[in-house]
Amino acid sequence: MNLWTTAAAVTLIATSAVAQNACATGKTLSDGVLTIATGNPAYYPWVMDDAPESKQGFEAAVAYAVAAEMGFADDAVTWVRTSFDQSIQPGAKNFDFNLQQFSITPEREEIVDFSLPYYSSAMAVLTTQAVIDDGAEATIDSLKTLVWGADANTTAVPMLNDLIAPDKAPLLYNDNVDVTAAMQARQIDAALFDLPTALYLSAVVVPNGALL
């Protein structure tokens, strides 16, 4: 089941470093260096093989394209890792900008600055074949009965509550790595992810993973 509520993937800007056609000299954390953050880990298809420096994957390629427009050569780009929660919390950051499929919300816009969206995606239900074999179906009535998990810091939580309203409150985790680990441990039945990430997780990360 795909939930066609659009989740905007955006660049999170932590400083005033990115400005179209503007000189970046003196506007980055380290002079002459553009520091870009990604997730830990960074998932396919956004970053291939968790290696953003390879320039392979949608967000890795976007990052180097932005760097080139700002006048930074590839060897002047450095990468750091942040959790989703660290990226959207108030306070000093260790990056110039961050690409991690952020959804834009009014609450987040009060804390950080976003670029225009560079990608929009449907949301998908990630589960396992065992849950489907036990009778789970792609209907709201069936989805309500499942045990859900979610990253507490993502828009998956309000989407679950508003669109599905599960019979049991979703179990909340620190990040999506913990969510998929909980699914593998059979602590939860299902979780919401953007469609590209859900396809990757079902094929590579979660044994016998499936989309419902």
What are these regions (language model features)?
Residues 49-52, 63-75, 140-142, 155-174, ...:
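Ligand-binding cleft/hinge of the Venus flytrap
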